[in-house]
């Protein structure tokens, strides 16, 4: 393989690596947890990060318990889990 082709291949591989998103990079592990409504009955609208849709979605939170993948606002969810 000529040095010109090798440089072109190296350049294309570098470009591909820069443009390919790395799933979960810098995302807290708790963003992977499913939504948990908790044990109480307050029925508050909260947001969680969904691994299936790769987006923040609404769920009904009972007001106590649950896990760390719960946010009062969609902006807080985006800042924490989407980036």
Swiss-Prot record:
Paired cysteines (S-S): 31-81, 40-64, 56-77
Signal peptide residue numbers: 1-25
Top-rank taxon: Eukaryota
Keyword set includes Acetylation: no
Entry GO terms, CC: extracellular space
GO MF annotation terms: serine-type endopeptidase inhibitor activity
Subcellular location, record wording: Secreted
Residue ranges constituting the BPTI/Kunitz inhibitor domain according to the UniProt record: 31-81
UniProt keyword list: Disulfide bond, Protease inhibitor, Secreted, Serine protease inhibitor, Signal
Cited InterPro entries: Kunitz_BPTI, Kunitz_BPTI_sf, Prtase_inh_Kunz-CS, TFPI/VKTCI-like
SUPFAM superfamilies linked to this entry: BPTI-like
Primary localisation category: secreted
Annotated tissue distribution: Expressed by the venom gland.
Keyword match Disulfide bond: yes
Site residues by UniProt (Reactive bond for chymotrypsin): 41-42
Protein family (similarity comment): Belongs to the venom Kunitz-type family.
Biological role stated in the UniProt entry: Serine protease inhibitor that inhibits chymotrypsin (Ki=3520 nM).
Protein's UniProt name: Kunitz-type serine protease inhibitor
